[in-house]
C-alpha cells in the first residue's frame, strides 16, 4: 500500500492475556493464557480485513480487543486517528459507529430473513432511532449510505434486495 495514504486502522503489538488462577476463595494468579500475543497490522481506506485461522487461535479475541470489548493487556489500536485503548466512553461509543465485526459463522451473523440492504442498514437505523448520530438521517440518506457501503466493499447494488 502506498505510504502516501494514512491507515484507517493501526494495530501495534496488540496483546490480550487472560489470567489463570488457583484456589476458590483467595484466587492467586498462577499463569496466563496468551490469546493474542503481539500482532501488528494496518488497514487502509477501501480495504477489508479478514482474519482467518484454526479454532481457538485468537481471531475473535483479536477483534474484540480492537473494538475494546476486551481491554487489551498492552499495545495500541488507532482508528481514524483516535487511540481506542486510551479513549473515554463517549469517544469509544462514537468510534463504534464505524466499526463492524462479522464473526466466523455467517449463518449465525447474518439473519437469513433479512435482505442484504436491511442487514447493512440495521446499525444506521438503530443509531438514528436512538438519536446517537451527529444529525438525523432520512430514509433516502440511509439508502444512499447502504449503496455507498456496498460499492466500497465491491458488492453489486443489484444484490441489496437478496437474502444472504
Walk through the language-model features, giving the residues of each.
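ABC-family P-loop ATPase nucleotide-binding domain
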Residues: 1-32
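The feature captures the beta-strand-to-loop junction immediately N-terminal to the Walker
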Residues: 52-53
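Helix-to-loop junction immediately C-terminal to a conserved catalytic motif
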Residues: 67
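Conserved ABC transporter NBD signature motif
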Residues: 75-83, 95
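Conserved ABC ATPase "signature" region
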Residues: 83, 128, 137-159
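Short helical segment in ABC ATPase nucleotide-binding domains corresponding to the A-loop/adjacent helical element
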Residues: 107, 113-126, 143, 147
